[in-house]
A protein has these predicted regions:
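Structured, solvent-exposed hinge/loop segments at the ends of secondary-structure elements
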Residues: 1-97, 114-118, 191
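Short, basic, helix/turn surface patches
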Residues: 59-66, 104, 206-210
Length: 220
């Protein structure tokens, strides 16, 4: 997440997407530009995985990403390649383990609840990494390749803060009809953990209060 800026931008068609991507790539302080439907720290969306009879087996985390996104974010492929076609998918090790595929993973077919997609062919396996936060147990994940847009991730050169300001300024000028607000991915990760910390502290406080009430009852 270091030196990565994130911002949400939607594009009307492929031509607009191509223009936008070339714009970002052409900025002198930009190293890499990719996109995903959600950053990993958000927890991603969900997809219900079905068996051959159409019965739900489990819910998997689900994300749509550009082909180079995993490499940009340091997500390592254990085998195979990133999905490129609409009906292709990459799964993580936990997903394959839940499906009991053993070592024969590539070429497997995933039946899912997204009827508009149809079955997905597994072309790659990602090594496990945490989505949401480290407080959340390892989750199954399935990834498809998607078009540029939604949550845009841009790795900036140093000085990061200065270049982030330039990015927001120049992108706002380039896309006057859109709301441009790039921010550090690390900031979003810190906010996600702060929510967990507040909940944890509130839980501990509630437990202490309950214990105090019980002790008062015993004494009284």
């Amino acid at each position: 997440a270091k030196h990565v800026a994130v911002g949400d931008l939607q594009f009307a068609d492929d031509a607009e997407r191509d223009v936008a991507r070339q714009f970002f790539r052409g900025l002198p302080y930009v190293e890499v530009v990719e996109s995903a439907s959600y950053p990993p720290c958000i927890g991603m969306s969900g997809m219900m995985i079905l068996n051959e009879s159409g019965k739900s087996i489990f819910s998997s985390r689900y994300c749509v990403e550009t082909e180079g996104y995993p490499q940009m974010m340091g997500m390592a492929l254990k085998e195979g390649r990133m999905a490129r076609e609409r009906n292709e998918a990459v799964v993580n090790e936990t997903f394959a383990r839940i499906m009991r595929w053993g070592d024969e993973i590539l070429g497997r077919v995933v039946h899912n609840s997204h009827t508009s997609l149809g079955d997905l062919k597994v072309v790659g396996v990602l090594k496990d990494f945490h989505t949401a936060s480290f407080y959340v147990p390892q989750q199954p994940l399935i990834v498809r390749c998607g078009k540029f847009g939604n949550s845009i991730h841009i790795r900036l050169k140093e000085p990061f803060v200065e270049n982030l300001s330039k990015l927001n300024s120049q992108a706002s000028e380039a896309f006057p009809g859109k709301t441009v607000d790039f921010y550090p991915l690390e900031q979003e990760m810190q906010e996600a953990y702060s929510i967990v910390r507040v909940f944890r502290d509130a839980t501990i406080l509630a437990a202490v209060v309950m214990l105090f009430v019980m002790l008062m009852g015993l004494i009284g």
